[in-house]
Amino acid sequence: MFGIITVTGEDHTGIIAAVTTALAEQDVNIVDVSQTLMDKWFTMILRVEFNEKATPISTLQGYMDSVGKREGLVIRIQSEALFNAVNEI
């Protein structure tokens, strides 16, 4: 399954390391990534691939919520199909 992950929050050292390490621990492969800084605000969007039977998206969201809480970030995960449907014009 492909998913889209958004990460937002106040910039600080270690955000990318914390997020990507957590994803690797859940056997999630990063297919594409884009990140930017706007003043003190960090934003990252990742396209990822993972086995939803082995790691349901709800389980992955819960795991990433704990990372977000620890790092002061908002991390949201949704299926790529849902992301595309919602963002289609």
Predicted features and spans:
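A conserved regulatory-domain signal marking ACT and ACT-like small-molecule sensing domains
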Residues: 1-89
